[in-house]
Amino acid sequence: MSMMKEFREFAMRGNVVDLAVGVIIGAAFGKIVSSFVADIIMPPLGLLIGGVDFKQFHLVLREAQGAVPAVVMNYGSFIQTIFDFVIVAFAIFLAIKLMNKVRRKQEEAPAAPPAPTAEEKLLTEIRDLLSQQQQPKL
């Protein structure tokens, strides 16, 4: 088997394709959540706090000296990233909760009783014949 054929079989397996689709959708969802947090959630939150832009929160560790830029810890961006994470984690939690609910409903559905085996059918016939023989003849 050639290496290309093996690779094609590997790449076209259901799990690999599903994983690739999940990664692509996850990346797009991450961008949507980042925009939602940065453009929708943080501005009103900053306004409630007093017109603050969280991205501008920083701590200067060392001032700029000539051509050397200042060393700055941007904790405002970190706070915004935490909001991103919490929203993504909550969305994943809701999705998994929904999937588990659907799975439980499928498991709760009663399974059809199994068809009688050949042995059970034969025993049923024998029982019926014996009961017919024991009935009084009219």
From Swiss-Prot:
PROSITE patterns hit by this protein: MSCL (PS01327)
Transmembrane segments: 10-30, 76-96
Gene Ontology MF terms in the entry: mechanosensitive monoatomic ion channel activity
Membrane disposition: Multi-pass membrane protein
One Pfam assignment: MscL
InterPro entries registered for this protein in UniProt: Mechanosensitive_channel_CS, MS_channel, MSC/AndL, MscL_channel
Keywords: Cell inner membrane, Cell membrane, Ion channel, Ion transport, Membrane, Transmembrane, Transmembrane helix, Transport
Top-level division of the source organism's lineage: Bacteria
Task performed by this protein: Channel that opens in response to stretch forces in the membrane lipid bilayer. May participate in the regulation of osmotic pressure changes within the cell.
Family as reported in the entry's similarity comment: Belongs to the MscL family.
Protein name from the UniProt record: Large-conductance mechanosensitive channel
Gene: mscL
